[in-house]
Amino acid sequence: MPKMKTNRSAAKRFRVTRKGKIIRNHAYKSHKTRKKRRNVLRALRKKDVVSSADKNRVLRLLGKK
């Protein structure tokens, strides 16, 4: 049976921590930032954890499951 291939676009967007959580970046921060509040843009810079509903799908894309 061949090896699982990693989805390269998912590998650039997600990272798995040692405890198994999946870290992602926020959306809506690349353009049209002039109309967004400063504290909103600051919050969008932080990383976020992928929800449990999407966790298995992302792990399959990363070739971890």
UniProtKB/Swiss-Prot annotation:
Name the source's superkingdom: Bacteria
One Gene Ontology MF term: structural constituent of ribosome
Q: Give GO terms for biological process.
A: translation
Keywords tagged on the record = Ribonucleoprotein, Ribosomal protein
The cross-references to Pfam families, in alphabetical order and at most eight, read:
Ribosomal_L35p
Known InterPro entries for this protein? Ribosomal_bL35, Ribosomal_bL35-like, Ribosomal_bL35_CS, Ribosomal_bL35_sf
Q: Name one GO cellular component term.
A: cytosolic large ribosomal subunit
Say if the entry is tagged with keyword Transferase.
no
Q: Please give the family membership noted in the entry.
A: Belongs to the bacterial ribosomal protein bL35 family.
- State the PANTHER family in the record: 54S RIBOSOMAL PROTEIN BL35M, LARGE RIBOSOMAL SUBUNIT PROTEIN BL35M
Protein name in the entry? Large ribosomal subunit protein bL35
Q: Which gene encodes it?
A: rpmI
